[in-house]
Amino acid sequence: MAAVTGLYGSIDEFLNHCSQSGDSAYSALRSLLERLEKPDTRTEARIFLAHLQKKLDNDGASQRCLETYHFQIQDIYLDRNEGTGYQNRKKFTMMVIPSIFMPEDWSFTFYEGINRHPDSIFKDKTVAELGCGNGWISIAIAEKWLPLKVYGLDINPRAVKISWINLYLNAFDEDGQPVYDSESKTLLDRVEFYESDLLSYCRDNHIELERIVGCIPQILNPNPDAMSKLVTENASEEFLHSLSNYCALQGFVEDQFGLGLIARAVEEGIDVIKPMGIMIFNMGGRPGQGVCKRLFERRGLSVNKLWQTKILQASDTDISALVEIEKNNPHRFEFFMGLVGDRPICARTAWAFGKACGRISHALSVYSCQLRHPNEVKKIFEFLKNGFHDISNSLDLSFEDDSVADEKIPFLAYLAGVLKDGSRFPYEPPTGNKRFRDLIASFMKTYHHVPLSTDNVAIFPSRATAIENSLRLFTPRLAIVEEHLTCNLPRQWLTSLEIEQTRDSKTPIDGITVIEAPRQSDLMIELIKKLKPQVVVTGIAQFEAVTSSAFEHLLRVTREIGSRLFIDISDQFELSSLPSSIGVLKYLARTPLPSHAAIICGLLRNRVYTDLEVAFVISEEQTIFDALTRTVELLQGNTALISQYYYGCLFHELLSFQIPDRRQTAEREAENVEASDIDMIGFSSSAISVLSQSELSVRVTEKSSLLHMDVDQIFLPTPTPVKAAIFESFARQNVTETECDVTPILRQFILNTWNFSVEHSAEFIYADFPLALFNKLVLCCIEEGGSLCMPAGSNGNYAAAAKFLNANIMSIPTEAEVGFKLTAKQLSSVLETVHKPWVYISGPTINPTGLLYSNEEMKSLLTVCARYGARTIIDTSFSGIKFNSQDWDGWNLDASLAGLTGNPSFSVCLLGGLFFKIPTGGLSYGFLVLKSGFLADSFRSSFSGLNKPHNTVRYTAKKLLELGEQKGNLTGAAQGQEKLLATRLKRLKETLENCGWEVIEARGGVSVIAKPSAYLGKNIKLEKDGSTWVTKLDGTNIREAMLRATGLCINGPSWTGIPDYCRFTFALEDGDFDRALDCIVKFNQLVK
């Protein structure tokens, strides 16, 4: 009888040892494996196993071997025909032990599904099998398809050891000699087995896979505590066997169907599989085929069902966990009575039928899955696994229309990259995101052969905004606007009949009259010739859009009569790799755009978000271009960054495969100017005043490297909950209106924050930025014939916007002794001289000083406003961040307003922004609360044309407000931010004071004001690029001097409205803040 040297004297001795217990048998088999692993004892050990199998067969013990000796050796026959590879072998010799799932219908069906793939699927590929059990499928794959490597993975350490024994059993014949395949390799060259929790072994060892196959448990353990035990080699056989039957909760939405482990396997597979890799999974049909299929599709995989059959439910598997799920869930699992039943029964019925000794079955399918956008989906899941696991339950990458998937998945990948790689959103100029403008110019150059530069493209929130801003910039006496483009214009423009002004009047009057006109060019041109408007805004009819003749005719006529022309190409412009021909762009390809004309294009045609809009304007006249971009800064604040990212991603997809600069741009003909532009209408007087005198943002150029301490934006690291909310808003599909409705929780937020009760009759109005809402209030003030009263020391952007709109502004003096706060005495002295006052108050945090109004101070100001019947705008947009405020008890607006009597026209509105306290950078959300009676109905047309936050932003806002109410991670992030900003303020104050500035210490917000006392009256001389700049420093040039000398942007006295006082914001990125302090020190040294 065979023996193993140094281990067992005979087979009987080996069997006697194994018969003692399962642990004894496993110990004996592990010792045998050690002999198989050593080349010098391998042959002897393999011969011993051959003799062992023969003895068990000859003794008739093979059928009861598992009960008697706690192991079993059996042959598995797979091929019907003559096999290939291993000398026409048709069988596999396999060993099992009690703690391993026995090969049966479940795994055989899985192999049959794999078998339906073409032979090339595994050839020379790197493969992993999840839940390999005793390894027979891994070995079968290696034998039949000759892969490069198969990794058999199982969480059960005993299964891995038995798999190695089975590998040796089949890699060597009964004489202990290696069996070679057609490539002269053995199974040992192709297969390896490792203990691994799903794909952790491959992930930890940086193994990229081309194929993943898995046949893993899909029923929750009836005893959840059992699954929390540590998986060790010495664990009980019952526990180890349960790993083959049951799974634990995995934290996925699919847990409710018992599919959580499969879901985790798929997501881990996405991480390690190569882009064109394939995953094949056995799916029990108990949850229903739709649920099983959706598990894969919502993770961005296309699914092919290879094989489906029915199998009997394993008698040792307890389905009571599924019964419990059905109790609290309308979903019903699918079982069948026997193999021939064709009507499904629920888990509860199946459980009862099984208890009554009935046989129940369920469908079993084999799914082959492949990533539809592999690189992008991988990037999405790479982002999710880094602290954003909860979002994966909201992720939905299933699309019925491939074109929708082709658009949305790349954007989600891009957004994931932005959120993962960037700790914060960068500063974006009002002109628009530089990358986005580059992409638009490149698209025009590549697809339409129009040689535009980035400096010819300005970004607007929408087409309607671009049109209204253009009209406000010029304030024409008469404008003709194509009828389809007038819907968002102010109603009074469309009803005015003041068109009898003399044509010789070169100075625009305040009122704008808009005449609607048809789009057809011959009718439009006839109106232009008869009415002689100063501005024309029109599109091109579809039947005229292909050629440039209609556009050229419009150019010629408008030039002859001195009209400015804005052409809308939104309806013809296509984001496509084969865009339709557009006559306007054909003209631009051969001729520069005339100075009196500009092109407006609203991007409306995306396949995912039909209501997500952004627009761009093209002008090749620098003065007009600069002025148009300033209107965005003055009237809207900026264009929503996420919208620019979305359309930028679409442009990028259309350009990414193109070879840059492959085609030489054709030379354009010089513009044939037949008339002088002198007769053209110029900018309105208020626009000229603001553009020439107000302090606006510094233009960013290719060569400039500026530091911005002049921007009301937080550039600190974006907290994880904020990133999660932003991504989830785009990752989800079919978001309901209720999930986006901010109003209920905002009403509660306002009550909790400022003790301001907002009744249900109050109106909430939303916009992308608070500045846009402020401007609409200014227009209401103008329409009422009121005066806008603003304290000296108000936000310079708001003051400039009100001037641009030509409001009647009354400045309320403030004094240094009280930190330039507005006092009741000063307010009263102004209001007693003003008719129909509108009072603007920034609070509790005052921008720009950073001081706080106490509750008593606010009550006294509201009392004065009530006495004089002032409409009062309380702007909370810059409030939320507080420090050095231990003695500040907050506001109680309800109490302050209670009992106030006076002029009946007194009313209060609340202006605010949701994201100022939270560093969201790229997001903004403005709100305006109008209590009943604040505005007459006739004023409401002033609010037309507002750019409302997109549903994704609304969803994010609601999510963050809810998180704030829960006092969780988001609250901690906000508190940490306040501590950081308090430290920043201290450092900035010390630096400024050491350099000769007088600082008024802030108590909140992100800005502080200071007076350059040590520099006033001193000369400074700067030399750069061969030129010299010399000046005597004063309040009018201190900002320019700082910028020229150091590249640091600050706000000067003309912005703060306080003589000699400049503003510094300090919510910069860490490195930028340190460099900004260095600039302040450098400037001090230069002046000295």
UniProtKB/Swiss-Prot annotation:
Pfam family, one: Aminotran_1_2
Compartments reported by the entry: Cytoplasm
Superkingdom, taxonomy of origin: Eukaryota
Entry GO CC: cytoplasm
Reaction(s) this enzyme catalyzes, per UniProt: L-methionine + S-adenosyl-L-methionine = S-methyl-L-methionine + S-adenosyl-L-homocysteine
GO molecular function, one term: methionine S-methyltransferase activity
Keywords: Cytoplasm, Methyltransferase, S-adenosyl-L-methionine, Transferase
EC number: 2.1.1.12
Top EC group: transferase
Main localization (coarse): cytoplasm
Cited Gene3D superfamilies: Aspartate Aminotransferase, domain 1, Type I PLP-dependent aspartate aminotransferase-like (Major domain), Vaccinia Virus protein VP39
InterPro entries reported in the protein's UniProt record: Aminotransferase_I/II_large (IPR004839), Met_S-MeTrfase (IPR025779), PyrdxlP-dep_Trfase (IPR015424), PyrdxlP-dep_Trfase_major (IPR015421), PyrdxlP-dep_Trfase_small (IPR015422), SAM-dependent_MTases_sf (IPR029063), Small_mtfrase_dom (IPR007848)
Alphabetical list of PROSITE patterns matching this protein: SAM_MT12 (PS51555)
UniProt-listed GO biological process terms: biosynthetic process; methylation
Comment on pH dependence: Optimum pH is 7.2.
Function according to Swiss-Prot or TrEMBL: Catalyzes the S-methylmethionine (SMM) biosynthesis from adenosyl-L-homocysteine (AdoMet) and methionine. SMM biosynthesis (by MMT1) and degradation (by HMT-1, HMT-2 and HMT-3) constitute the SMM cycle in plants, which is probably required to achieve short term control of AdoMet level. Also able to catalyze the selenium-methylmethionine (SeMM) from AdoMet and selenium-methionine (SeMet). May play a role in phoem sulfur transport; such function is however not essential.
Family statement: Belongs to the class I-like SAM-binding methyltransferase superfamily.
UniProt subunit comment: Homotetramer.
Record's protein name: Methionine S-methyltransferase
